[in-house]
Curated annotation (Swiss-Prot):
Its EC number is 4.1.1.37. Pathway: Porphyrin-containing compound metabolism; protoporphyrin-IX biosynthesis; coproporphyrinogen-III from 5-aminolevulinate: step 4/4. The record marks D77 as: Transition state stabilizer. GO terms for molecular function: uroporphyrinogen decarboxylase activity. Substrate binds at R27, Q28, A29, G30, R31, D77, Y154, S209, H327. Catalyzes the decarboxylation of four acetate groups of uroporphyrinogen-III to yield coproporphyrinogen-III. It comes from Saccharophagus degradans (strain 2-40 / ATCC 43961 / DSM 17024). PANTHER family: METHYLTETRAHYDROFOLATE:HOMOCYSTEINE METHYLTRANSFERASE RELATED, UROPORPHYRINOGEN DECARBOXYLASE. This is Uroporphyrinogen decarboxylase. CDD domains: URO-D (cd00717).
């Protein structure tokens, strides 16, 4: 077992004392970095990066060379599971992910098989083990998956969607078939994340990008319940350490109390929820991750620092906070502004941990 030189991130997730608030950024390996764009050009396209463990490792580590981050996150895509189910993932420039096949009937769902990660997605596990080796204990590595609901939206719509009309029609017209789809996806996510943990992931995050589009009750049935099932099925210890789990529903602020009962160690917050109020609502059940608006990175470094100070003050003293953006960093951000954000967290947060 490699000794972790910096375990601040894992300690905060488990609400253990830390010397300062740990920080990382969703999509920290991404198009805002010129070195990422250069590696992606060499790979040919996005999937060429994802499916090559050495290149995936290279881009995973790039932000750590620039910034004093407290965690690395596996470079991959949330849609690897539907791709492994045979739907044929591809990317069109400027249009995002698309699938050659879609799911539209109960018969389509019946035919889907739960994935076998080592057989279907070996390149992901190879990337995890390669990154762990190269990190050599520098910081922990986060593995991840999309949530069943979020994966289902892409599988049914065939790509991105503004209103999820087809997926919502499925859950309302054919709730039993929709439940079967969520079950198969939950079982696939359990297998996928456990394989990542076996390969060396030291924490895992479930990205529920589109849960916030659901009604109050539909969220609990078709998004939260499958995620709770996943949390229950995950390996919670590896290499003698607990493997913490983060749940992140974009637009999920109204469900924090229910999410806190799902068994995860930490809840991710987007920027529409006040983190101080969120802390009061969940108490000491879970840690919180977030939640600066990524668009603030387009402001001046001084304004970025002010916003970091405001969020730290809102959360208040003590552990249980992982600083992050409220969603992924966007491609037009100046890398210097991202650096100002990371440095501000380090410089301003120690006073809250005395």
């Amino acid at each position: 077992m490699t000794v972790l030189k910096n375990d601040r991130f894992l300690r905060a997730l488990m609400r253990q004392p830390v010397d300062q608030t740990p920080v990382w950024m969703m999509r920290q390996a991404g198009r805002y970095l010129p070195e990422y764009r250069a590696t992606r050009a060499q790979a040919g396209d996005f999937m060429g990066l994802c499916t090559n463990p050495e290149r995936a490792c290279e881009v995973t580590l790039q932000p750590l060379e620039r910034y004093p981050l407290d965690a690395a996150i596996l470079f991959s895509d949330i849609l690897t599971i539907p791709d492994a189910m045979g739907l044929g993932l591809y990317f069109e420039t400027g249009e995002g992910p698309k699938f050659k096949k879609t799911i539209s009937t109960a018969a389509d769902i019946e035919k889907l098989e739960v994935i076998k990660p080592l057989q279907d997605l070996p390149y992901v596990m190879d990337a995890v083990s390669t990154i762990r080796r190269e990190l050599n204990g520098r910081v922990p590595l986060i593995g991840f998956s999309g949530s069943p609901w979020t994966l289902a939206t892409y599988m049914v719509e065939g790509g991105s969607s503004k209103d999820f009309q087809k997926t919502k029609a499925l859950i309302y017209n054919h709730p039993e078939a929709a439940a079967q789809l969520m079950d198969k996806l939950a079982d696939s996510v359990i297998a996928y994340l456990n394989a990542q943990i076996d390969a060396g992931a030291q924490a895992v995050q479930i990205f529920d990008s589109w849960g916030g589009a659901l009604s109050h009750d539909a969220y609990k049935t078709f998004s939260l319940a499958p995620m709770a099932k996943i949390v229950k099925g995950l390996k919670r210890e590896n290499e003698g350490r607990k493997v913490p789990v983060i749940l992140f529903t974009k637009g999920g602020g109204q469900w924090l109390e229910a999410m806190a009962d799902a068994g995860a160690d930490c809840l991710g917050l987007d920027w529409t929820t006040d983190i101080g109020q969120a802390r009061a609502r969940v108490g000491d059940k879970v840690a919180l991750q977030g939640n600066m608006d990524p668009s603030i990175l387009y402001a001046s470094p001084d304004r970025i620092r002010e916003e970091v100070a405001r969020i730290l003050a809102s959360y208040g003293a003590g552990t249980g906070h992982v600083f992050n953006l409220g969603h992924g960093i966007t491609p037009g951000v100046d890398p210097e502004h991202a650096g100002a954000f990371i440095r501000a967290v380090g410089e301003l947060s120690a006073q809250y941990h005395k």
